[in-house]
Amino acid sequence: MKSFVLFAACMAIVALSSLAHAYPQKLPVPIPPPTNPPVAAFHNSVATNSKGGQDVSVKLAATNLGNKHVQPIAEVFAEGNTKGGNVIRGATVGVQGHGLGASVTKSGNGIAESFRKQAEANLRLGDSASLIGKVSQTDTKIKGIDFKPQLSSSSLALQGDRLGASISRDVNRGVSDTLTKSISANVFRNDNHNLDASVFRSDVRQNNGFNFQKTGGMLDYSHANGHGLNAGLTRFSGIGNQANVGGYSTLFRSNDGLTSLKANAGGSQWLSGPFANQRDYSFGLGLSHNAWRG
């Protein structure tokens, strides 16, 4: 019954998008914006937390500060929960251009500090295909503890117009090593509707000797007006199967397209295994605003 209610809620979010109408402004003399103007983007989101309270995050980013060849990246962010606890604060700086990019992020919550380094490369293979590679490393320092957790990730993806494939590896030093392979395909696409399908397999090796596999698939539908639905099924070897469903919608978008309000809802349920019938639900709102300058 609850799964039906969740699905109905997702459908309701999509239906709400029909209430948002955009009325184009008619200016006697259209004035184009400056070439490649800087933009400050503000993002704010609120989401339910299964452990209680609401997770709140804010981010302020400045992009388009460079030229058509090189773009600096700069942002600050904060995350916390309405029930209290330590607030995570951080900042990211980087640069991207000519298909290459690099950034560093430092964050902390008063108990632990993390420093993340990331680099990526995008190689165009003709008009409709790209080969994308990413590597990152996150070092964490916890106050009063000598052990310093380290998470390393690397991925290689081939993305075409209708098909895609990727392989990635995530190493959590002293904890686990995960290798994931995935394939995606565009099933249907026109001016308004898009339907994608994907399958994946993850081999998880943990240092405590408990190893398992995750295999699954997902269908993802999206509409040009900014709403969509997705559903997936994941099998954990030796544990059980878990179903997921979600939906999102753009509730409001300003006439100039610079401000938008989005909502999302989702949930999961274990279908078998020791966690059978255990459910998790979530709901969130996201507000974003881009302030043009120049």
Swiss-Prot record:
Assigned keywords, A-Z: Amidation, Antibiotic, Antimicrobial, Immunity, Innate immunity, Pyrrolidone carboxylic acid, Repeat, Secreted, Signal
Primary localisation category: secreted
Arginine amide found at: 293
Coiled coil: none
Modified residues (Pyrrolidone carboxylic acid): 25
Any one cellular-component term (Gene Ontology): extracellular region
Domain of life: Eukaryota
Tissue expression profile of the protein: Synthesized by the fat body and is eventually secreted into the hemolymph.
Localization terms from the record: Secreted
InterPro entries registered for this protein in UniProt: Attacin_C, Attacin_N
Signal peptide: 1-22
Pfam family, one: Attacin_N
GO biological process, one term: innate immune response
Propeptide segment residues: 23-24
Role description: Sarcotoxin II is an antibacterial protein which plays a role in the inflammatory response of this insect. The main effect of sarcotoxin II on E.coli may be the inhibition of cell wall synthesis, including septum formation.
More about this protein: Sarcotoxin II consists of at least four structurally related proteins named sarcotoxin IIa, II-1, II-2, and II-3.
Similarity comment: family membership: Belongs to the attacin/sarcotoxin-2 family.
Name of the protein: Sarcotoxin II-3
